[in-house]
Amino acid sequence: MTSTEAAGTGKAPAIRANPALQTYYESQESYLVYEVVLRGSHHFGFYEKDTYWPFPVGRSLERMEAKLLSALALPSGSQILDAGCGFGPVAISMAKKGMRVTAIDIIDHHVTKARRNVEKAGLPKGQVTVEKMDYQHLESIASESHDDAKAAATGFFRILKPGGRIAFFEAQRSRTSGDYDEGDELAGHLKLVNEYTAMPTNELSREDYFKDLLEDAGFVDVEFTLPPGTREPREHWSYSALKA
């Protein structure tokens, strides 16, 4: 069985149709933001307290990647799944720290560019593998090998070995569009952001949303902390949890 075949079927892994997400990440706007401004990354930067000038952006992105790896608390040589890898900078960063990484994405040009970037990085063969795969359909990844959020959390739990850890940084909203009066201008803007940038959890991620999501999937010791350098104290949180 190859890594691009669903377990036991010989078929390519299932990709859930998501026109909004695919359209956004294939747009010129997406290219300008992620390729030009964020050097291929698809995540927030980490800024020290009282930082008001965000440039150069690359350093803040590297700091956030280091924070993520620290939250995983894994020894060198561990197997990591980078779900939604974009152009591969996080996978490459972790591989340079000695990790073995399976990087997945559903956008064709992301997969192509990530493979190219891995090759350019000069990493040992097989240390990073890049596949087109949907993190809501992880059937092709064997159990204990490492924008239906519930399905994704359940899938992550299944493939982790006992004692394995999940870690991510996510936005936890103090208010969503549903908290505003009908017709409110800000509510309308929030809905547009959610719809056209494929960010449906913006409508769901109230207090304890991600904690409950992880616990319902079976994770234990769920921790959530505000990174000390974050400038929006009610928005961005670090989450980590264990598979018992």
UniProtKB/Swiss-Prot annotation:
One of its GO terms (molecular function) is sterol 24-C-methyltransferase activity. Its EC number is 2.1.-.-. Its cofactor is S-adenosyl-L-methionine. One of its GO terms (cellular component) is endoplasmic reticulum. Belongs to the class I-like SAM-binding methyltransferase superfamily. Erg6/SMT family. S-adenosyl-l-methionine-dependent Diels-Alderase; part of the gene cluster that mediates the biosynthesis of ilicicolin H, a 4-hydroxy-2-pyridonealkaloid that has potent and broad antifungal activities by inhibiting the mitochondrial respiration chain. IliD catalyzes the Diels-Alder reaction that converts the acyclic 2-pyridone intermediate to 8-epi-ilicicolin H. The biosynthesis of ilicicolin H starts with formation of the tetramic acid by the hybrid PKS-NRPS synthetase iliA with the partnering trans-enoyl reductase iliB since iliA lacks a designated enoylreductase (ER) domain. This is S-adenosyl-L-methionine-dependent Diels-Alderase iliD. It comes from Neonectria sp. (strain DH2). The gene is iliD.
